[in-house]
């Protein structure tokens, strides 16, 4: 009888080309997603050495980081962005790669379009020159970010050199209370393990609460695995995953689908499989969460207060949290619900999908954005935007005073016109609250879409569980 293995072990073993004596491995890569920021040097490297893209049919390119989310018929104000966008278009054409430009309905954030096109599939290995590639693990794919030199290596060989990570299982038992979401689950996990707790691991998310999440919710959880320090995050595929992918443009069809299903149904950790570390959370005890500092581990319940760093024993950590408080312009002991906001951003590869927009629209309907807040909603892709408009969500947002934008990474990161001004405070559905992440000296609080929408209307954080 074979030894019980984890889901990660199974996918790894199925893609292992070679293992050296020192544990360095060569792994076959099934899918490669490419965007405009981390690819120019990689293509230049291919050109300089006379190489071709080894498997252009397994490569998909899209612009997302630098594109403006306003009217795209008007000139892009940033010369560097123009150059990177043009470079990707030229490289895709030269090397024979399918490419979605900023005017293509299929364009969007790379980690939104992969699943919605059926390019992301269970049991595959997926890489991209972007840290949030872990998103695709929601479908039972082994997916993680790579550096620019590795982008070149994968383009040239369809393989990647790496060492195997350890296994960690995070089991979330119980049922989530109303108003608590997948975003709150992953923020709670990061708050528990810290931003380095997952270092050297691939995380598998399991348990009743994870199974109850939609595919959008699972993508949110897997998306932020990297913020917990993990290499990747995984959820074993089930009927929800299959239903999501069925009939997608790039998903298998007919007999090929049936054959794929026979493989996919085996993609789960065996009973008795060894995990190097286990963590359990009770979903029923989770509140809506807000980050207060400059690290995703700086989490607190919306009903809580800004913590006092002086109560931290470790000196380095104490000084770090004091710095965070100063940067954020907050005082220990302040109620989270007393924190006033200047901006609200609903979107990103964490929370820019149709379910996220529906949740925000449900809160916003019939209400009005606070006069002190500038709020914007940025769909994760052209397909999401089209669906939202078909459901009338755009009208709900616009009537409530939100800006309704074109798809892209937008205010998740300060690489396009959507930026915070110095000391502006933003409730954001994105994944990182680092210093300067959304703009020079900008202050970011991470929340769920419903929490962000409620904060936009109230002008400060509110407990969405009590929203009327």
Curated annotation (Swiss-Prot):
Binds 1 [4Fe-4S] cluster per subunit. The keyword Metal-binding applies. Gene3D superfamilies: Aconitase, domain 3. It catalyses: (2R,3S)-3-isopropylmalate = (2S)-2-isopropylmalate. Heterodimer of LeuC and LeuD. The lineage of its organism: Bacteria, Pseudomonadati, Pseudomonadota, Alphaproteobacteria, Hyphomicrobiales. NCBIfam families: leuC, PRK05478.1, PRK12466.1. Pfam families: Aconitase (PF00330). The gene is leuC2. It comes from Bradyrhizobium diazoefficiens (strain JCM 10833 / BCRC 13528 / IAM 13628 / NBRC 14792 / USDA 110). This is 3-isopropylmalate dehydratase large subunit 2. Catalyzes the isomerization between 2-isopropylmalate and 3-isopropylmalate, via the formation of 2-isopropylmaleate. The keyword rRNA processing does not apply. Its EC number is 4.2.1.33. GO terms for biological process: L-leucine biosynthetic process. PANTHER family: 3-ISOPROPYLMALATE DEHYDRATASE, HOMOACONITASE, MITOCHONDRIAL-RELATED. Belongs to the aconitase/IPM isomerase family. LeuC type 1 subfamily.
């Amino acid at each position: 009888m074979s030894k019980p293995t984890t889901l990660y072990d199974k996918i790894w073993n199925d893609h292992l080309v070679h293992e050296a004596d020192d544990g360095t491995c060569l792994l076959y890569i099934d899918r490669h997603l490419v965007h405009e920021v981390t690819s120019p040097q990689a293509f230049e490297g291919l050109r300089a050495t006379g190489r071709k893209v080894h498997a252009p049919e397994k490569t998909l390119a899209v612009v997302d980081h630098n594109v403006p989310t306003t009217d795209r018929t008007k000139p892009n104000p940033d010369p560097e962005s123009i150059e990177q966008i043009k470079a990707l278009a030229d490289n895709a054409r030269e090397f024979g790669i399918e490419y979605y430009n900023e005017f293509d309905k299929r364009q969007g954030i790379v980690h939104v379009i992969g699943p919605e096109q059926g390019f992301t599939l269970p049991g595959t290995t997926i890489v991209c020159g972007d840290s949030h590639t872990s998103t695709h693990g929601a479908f039972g794919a082994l997916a993680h970010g790579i550096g620019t030199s590795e982008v070149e290596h994968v383009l040239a060989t369809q393989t990647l050199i790496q060492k195997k990570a350890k296994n960690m299982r995070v089991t979330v038992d119980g049922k989530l209370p109303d108003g608590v979401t997948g975003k709150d689950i992953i923020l709670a996990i990061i708050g528990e393990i810290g931003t380095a707790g997952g270092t050297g691991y691939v995380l598998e998310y399991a348990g009743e609460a994870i199974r109850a999440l939609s595919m959008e919710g699972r993508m949110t959880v897997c998306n932020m695995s990297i913020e917990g320090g993990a290499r990747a995050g995984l959820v074993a595929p089930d009927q929800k995953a299959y239903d999501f992918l069925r009939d997608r443009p790039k998903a298998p069809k007919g007999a090929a689908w049936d054959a794929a299903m026979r493989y996919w149904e085996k993609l789960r950790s065996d009973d008795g499989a060894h995990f190097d570390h286990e963590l359990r959370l009770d979903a029923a005890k989770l509140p809506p969460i807000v980050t207060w500092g400059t690290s995703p581990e700086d989490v607190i319940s919306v009903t809580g207060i800004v913590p006092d760093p002086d109560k931290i024993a470790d000196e380095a950590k104490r000084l770090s949290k004091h710095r965070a408080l100063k940067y954020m312009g907050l005082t220990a002991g302040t109620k989270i619900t007393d924190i006033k906001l200047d901006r609200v951003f609903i979107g990103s590869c964490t929370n820019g999908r149709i379910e996220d927009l529906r949740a925000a629209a449900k809160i916003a309907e019939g209400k009005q954005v606070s006069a002190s807040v500038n709020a914007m909603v940025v769909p994760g892709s052209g397909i999401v935007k089209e669906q939202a408009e078909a459901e009338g969500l755009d009208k709900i947002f616009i009537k409530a005073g939100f800006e309704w934008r074109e798809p892209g990474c937008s205010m998740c990161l300060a690489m396009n016109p959507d930026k915070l001004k110095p000391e502006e405070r933003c409730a954001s559905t994105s994944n990182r609250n680092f210093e300067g992440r959304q703009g020079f000296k900008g202050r970011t609080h991470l929340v769920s879409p419903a929490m962000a929408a409620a904060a936009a209307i109230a002008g400060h954080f509110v407990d969405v569980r009590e929203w009327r």
